[in-house]
Each structure stands twice: as C-alpha cells, then as structure tokens.
Amino acid sequence: MFVIIKSAKKTPAGVVGYWERDWDDQKVWEVGWSVLPDYQRQGIVTAATRLLIAFVTKLKSHRYIFSYPSINNNPSNAICRKLGFTLIGDRNFEYPPGKVLHCNIWRLDLLQIS
C-alpha cells in the first residue's frame, strides 16, 4: 500500500495498493484504492493508480491487473475506464467477511501498456 499525499503540506489524501492473487489458475495483480471524502473527485486516485500501474508494469511478473469495484461505485468504475481497464464481467465477492458485495471485474493487460 502507498499513501497518497496531497500538496506540499504532505497531507494524506488516501491510499492505493496492489497485491498478488490467483485468477483462473494464474497469478495476477489486484489493485485497489480509497480516498478521503475531502479529496474525492479531484483526479487524485486516477493519477496515483496510473503511477502504480507504471510501477507494476516494470516488475514484469504478471500479465494482468484486476480491479473489483462495487457495481454501484460509479467513481471507481470510471477510474478503471479512464485507465484503460476492460470490463469483463461481474461477480459476487464476500467483502468484508460476512457481507456479499456485487462487483464489476475490470482487467488491464500489461502487455498492451507502452
């Protein structure tokens, strides 16, 4: 996880992170983010995730990055769209434990990143 810092005051605005997971019998990256309400809708997460994608691409360890925002989380789905992810479906996930969350499945092919 990385803390997203806003401005020269070094104010934390949110977090963005990546981790390894299994998807259809292959290792992939999953990316996720959270931003504090005062910093939403400013492009901060899009910019931070773009930097994270560049970092992960250089690792050359997995072909895909996935993201699983709730189908009702329009801002997070828009971030995936802006960053070139492809919507490949939806699925129910248990998150947090004990709660079912209906999520979109977004995939970014790192081989297509120039």
Regions found by a protein language model. Name each.
Residues 1-114:
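Acyl-donor (CoA/ACP) binding surface of acyl/acetyltransferases
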